[in-house]
């Protein structure tokens, strides 16, 4: 699925099921500059991520129900520190130093049935 956030466009995998969310990007050795994973939740809630089995340094972008960025936290490879935020409906994982900032907005393109988030 293609998304835009800030001034960048990404091709993302969408994680909707609990199994997809738990797996995340754990098995990836690298991530393309314009690649990422978008986690979609049913309603705004407190969300915690960690990097325990993830080899790639990531920006973890927490967004509210309107797709507005609440915060961007840096995840370090294999770190077990919890990175938490409340009021979250979407989380985007992309390479670190993405330039995404609080207040940026998520735009999802309608190119397939993934647009029905």
What are these regions (language model features)?
Residues 1-117:
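Compact, glycine-rich, soluble single-domain proteins
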């Amino acid at each position: 699925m293609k998304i835009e956030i800030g001034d960048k466009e990404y091709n993302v995998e969408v994680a909707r099921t609990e199994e997809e969310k738990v797996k995340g990007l754990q098995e990836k050795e690298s991530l393309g500059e314009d690649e990422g994973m978008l986690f979609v939740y049913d309603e705004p809630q407190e969300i915690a991520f960690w990097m325990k089995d993830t080899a790639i340094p990531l920006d973890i972008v927490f967004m509210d129900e309107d797709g507005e960025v609440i915060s961007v936290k840096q995840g370090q490879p294999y770190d077990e520190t919890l990175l938490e935020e409340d009021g979250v409906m979407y989380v985007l994982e992309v390479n670190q130093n993405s330039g995404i900032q609080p207040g940026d907005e998520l735009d999802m393109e309608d190119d397939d049935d993934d647009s029905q988030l």
